[in-house]
Amino acid sequence: MMEIKPIGYVKNNAEEDVDFDELVSIIEILPDYVDGLYRIEECDELEIIFYFHKSSSYKLRVHPHHDPTQPEVGVFSSRSPNRPNFLGLTRVKLLKREGNVLFVKGLDAFNGTPVIDIKPVTRRDQRK
């Protein structure tokens, strides 16, 4: 069995119809993991892995953006939060760090979302 523990939580005032691209969120890192932030402010962009805590079920076929006028696609061809393992991944801009708190822009997660991992975006990730 696999055990995954949150390293922190998202704090924001996001509603269902928010423009996540412009939303500034706080990621509050738990005390046991703060040392893992060492030199993170040298990164411009981060990839945030999180748990869709508001999802409770999934389908293997979905309509993109929950729009029934769009043709169905497989869940792995979509950004749907209703996935078999309820994991999300978003690239964000790191605005600043204050102790155990990261200020990021563009995170498509709601208040209270558990953060599972953080990775820097590297040149390798930007290859076409």
Regions found by a protein language model. Name each.
Residues 1-91, 95-128:
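Glycine-rich, low-complexity intrinsically disordered segments
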